Amino acid sequence: LPQIDYTEPLGKYGRMRLVYLKNQRPVLYNRMLLNGTLWPHLQDVQKTAYAWLERTMTTLLDKYPAPDKERAQLLWVAHMNGLKAQAEEVVVREIVYQ
């Protein structure tokens, strides 16, 4: 096996992609593992996913503005959690499971 530098830990989306490749695309997983391209691919997916998440959250906040945080803290938290769940759903579907 090739020597790979594992200095940067994988985040949530990188780990999700790893599990997806192992379970759903084992031939691609093994090829990438043997070629030494798996770790860079997982890091790239992770960076792309976080960029998409940030961009999607911004778009959703523009489309669905949050209530005033000072007056309605619980509503604001619920609203932001809902938007984050929607954004994560998009990221997982479009980036991780493709």
Which ranges hold each PLM region?
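Metallocofactor- and cofactor-centric catalytic cores in central/energy metabolism, strongly enriched
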Residues: H41, Y50
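C-terminal charged interaction modules
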Residues: T58-Q98
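Short N-terminal mixed-charge amphipathic segments
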Residues: L1-G36
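Short coil/turn segments at secondary-structure junctions
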Residues: L33, P40, R71-L74
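Core catalytic machinery and nucleic-acid-binding channels of phosphodiester-processing enzymes
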Residues: V45
